[in-house]
UniProtKB/Swiss-Prot annotation:
Pathway: Amino-acid biosynthesis; S-adenosyl-L-methionine biosynthesis; S-adenosyl-L-methionine from L-methionine: step 1/1. L-methionine binds at E57, Q101, D244, K275. Mg(2+) binds at D18. GO terms for biological process: one-carbon metabolic process; S-adenosylmethionine biosynthetic process. This is S-adenosylmethionine synthase. PANTHER family: S-ADENOSYLMETHIONINE SYNTHETASE. NCBIfam families: metK. GO terms for cellular component: cytoplasm. Binds 2 divalent ions per subunit. Its cofactor is Mg(2+); K(+). Residues 101-111 are annotated as: Flexible loop. Its main location: cytoplasm. It holds the Pfam family S-AdoMet_synt_M.
């Protein structure tokens, strides 16, 4: 395992077109779950210039009206902050193509008198945790998220008047002996108002971004000025869905571990928690984080796999990357004794049948604060049980 290297992760803001789509899709998931905790939802979203299109499959014991769906979609876009000529929450055309879930899928997934609830699809899902940040996340992604959250905070609180919603960040860190010690390059592109179109305006933006870097990064981590790139292509006035079309599920590395861990390929947003693409990835993160917090490893990757219609996972794999203090096979043996890794077992343990998903659709699904019903997969309530299992 290498100990001295450079590593890079990127993040995108809540106003990035793909994230706009993710937030709309998860707002629809939350809307249905708020009416029926057992609702089935698979909602995809396309956003482009003055158009919002949703489609997919739903099943709910409580009907949700077309008007409620449209109101939820427009409110989501309003909260992000889009009131631009090319994309305005009030006037964008909206089309709803949601329809009933396939009966073929339902018969294989639903629980019956003689069987447990099956997985909603086949697939592989990964969880990861590392001790390099307090949130047990890769430092590169942690800081990439925090930088953009700071920009959004300043924009929403009107601390600055020149930022628009669309932005991207990228952080390259120097690792020495496996520990991040400083940044070697920082990249940020942010949509801005026409007021910054002049050379002086671009200099003002650069100074502002540098001040954010200095506040967010640990002291002494700033790279050379020539390695700080702010809007490197020049002006960025046309952005959001007007500049690029956005689709649900296209930022899966931003959503997870910034490239520091494998990804099974399944996106999260727009899916109710019976879909193991989402719930199994959440429980894999939950297990990985608790393993590291319990001191059983400094870094761990977990893989789960499922077959559609089958409740129990087909495989469970644990890799501590040479940092473990206990045998990996023993961890694999212990984990299913602490939590049932069936779709229903996961949803029950983590209490996932609630309208809690829209906040996860921007700035990462992992490394967030478990707060009330939100982000329950970030809780550390297995630590004592894991320690006891290896005492």
């Amino acid at each position: 395992m290498r100990s001295n290297y450079l590593f890079t992760s990127e993040s995108v803001s809540e106003g990035h077109p793909d994230k706009v789509a993710d937030q709309i899709s998860d707002a629809i998931v939350d809307l249905y779950l708020s009416r029926d905790p057992e609702a089935r939802v698979a909602c995809e979203t396309l956003v482009t210039t003055q158009r919002i299109i949703i489609g997919g499959e739903v099943r709910s014991a409580v009907p949700v009206s077309e008007e409620e769906i449209e109101k939820t979609v427009r409110e989501t876009v309003r909260e992000i902050g889009y009131e631009q000529t090319g994309f305005d929450w009030r006037t964008a055309e909206f089309a709803n193509h949601l329809h009933a879930q396939s009966a073929d899928i339902a018969q294989g997934v639903d629980a019956g008198e003689d069987k447990d609830e099956g997985a909603g699809d086949q697939g592989i899902m990964f969880g990861f945790a590392t001790d390099e940040t307090p949130d047990y996340m890769p430092a590169t992604l942690y800081y990439a998220h925090r930088i953009l959250e700071r920009l959004a905070e300043d924009r929403h609180q009107k601390k600055v008047d020149f930022l628009e919603p669309d932005a991207k960040s990228q952080v390259t860190l120097v690792y020495e002996n496996g520990v991040p010690v400083r940044a070697s390059a920082l990249v940020l592109s942010t949509q801005h108002s026409p007021a910054l179109s002049s050379k002086e305006g671009q200099a003002k933006l650069r100074d502002y971004v540098k001040s954010v870097y200095e506040d967010v990064l640990p002291k002494g981590w700033m790279p050379d000025d020539k390695a700080i790139f702010v809007n490197p292509t020049g002006l960025f006035e046309i952005g959001g869905p007007d500049g690029d079309a956005g689709l649900t599920g296209r930022k899966i590395i931003v959503d997870t571990y910034g490239g520091a861990a494998p990804h099974g390929g399944g996106a999260f947003s727009g899916k109710d928690p019976t879909k193991v693409d989402r719930s199994a990835a959440y429980v894999a993160r939950y297990l990985a984080k608790n393993i590291v917090a319990a001191g059983l490893a400094k870094k761990v990757t977990i893989q789960l796999s499922y077959a559609i219609g089958v409740s129990e996972p087909l495989s469970l794999y644990v890799d501590t990357h040479g940092t473990g203090t206990v045998d990996e096979a023993k961890i694999e043996e212990v984990l299913p004794k602490l939590i049932r890794l069936t779709p229903k077992g996961i949803r029950t343990h983590l209490k996932l049948n609630k309208p809690i998903y829209k906040p996860s659709a921007a700035y990462g699904h992992f490394g967030r604060k478990a707060d009330g019903d939100f982000f329950p997969w970030e809780k550390l309530d297995l630590v004592d049980k894991l320690k006891a299992a290896f005492a």
